[in-house]
Amino acid sequence: MKTLSPEGSLWVFGYGSLIWHPPPHYDYSIPCFIKGYVRRFWMRSEDHRGTVNSPGLVLTLIPYEEWKQFSDWSFTPFDEGCWGMAFRIPAKYATQVREYLDDREVNGYTAHSVPVYAHTGDEIPVLENCLVYVGTSKSPQFQPSDDLTQMAKIISTRRGKSGDNFVYLFELAKCLRHLSPESKDIHVFELEAEVRKQMQKTR
């Protein structure tokens, strides 16, 4: 939409920490979702939420058809779309913010352009081109798993330069509950519940 995208502006889609820690200089944001991807805690973090010796787990997006190759597909419901937040960066800051994000997402992520939608069932995107960073399955940091208990054990105990791994998960779950009446993510909410259960046992 032209009214939403002045010439030279940059739109960025956040599906993880960008939702509550948005890029600098944004002047507008939209709750929205992208189609054809699932969100999973399948990327090792050796910097922000863990260390080289004790990596944490952070998010990536997996194309739906690729996700079907992994074992958690057989018993995990597929929610249409991945909810997050799109942020508009004015043209005069676009290059600066792109460089900032390239550096922030350096650990195994690549940049892609995707359409985003405002409501479940929409056929026409609210934005045609939105920048998103995806940790692909070819990344050495990619670590698929269907073991929720083991994933929760990692997330509940790891810490990196950006803080505790479990805070990353809890902040995401909180944001998803408030983004939109339509926003949900079964994987995130089930993992959050398991982490809270494990942390309660250790207190």
Swiss-Prot record:
GO terms for molecular function: glutaminyl-peptide cyclotransferase activity; glutathione specific gamma-glutamylcyclotransferase activity. Its EC number is 4.3.2.7. Belongs to the gamma-glutamylcyclotransferase family. ChaC subfamily. Gene3D superfamilies: Gamma-glutamyl cyclotransferase-like (3.10.490.10). CDD domains: GGCT_like. The lineage of its organism: Eukaryota, Fungi, Dikarya, Ascomycota, Taphrinomycotina. This is Glutathione-specific gamma-glutamylcyclotransferase. PANTHER family: CATION TRANSPORT PROTEIN CHAC-RELATED, GLUTATHIONE-SPECIFIC GAMMA-GLUTAMYLCYCLOTRANSFERASE 2. Gamma-glutamylcyclotransferase acting specifically on glutathione, but not on other gamma-glutamyl peptides. Allows utilization of gluthathione through subsequent cleavage of the Cys-Gly dipeptide by Cys-Gly metallodipeptidase dug1. Pfam families: ChaC (PF04752). It catalyses: glutathione = L-cysteinylglycine + 5-oxo-L-proline. Keywords: Cytoplasm, Lyase, Nucleus. InterPro entries: ChaC, GGCT-like, GGCT-like_sf. It is found in: Cytoplasm; Nucleus. The keyword Lyase applies. One of its GO terms (cellular component) is cytosol. It is an enzyme of class 4 (lyase). SUPFAM superfamilies: Gamma-glutamyl cyclotransferase-like. The active site is at E105. Substrate binds at V12, F13, G14, Y15, G16, S17. GO terms for biological process: cellular detoxification; glutathione catabolic process. Its main location: cytoplasm.
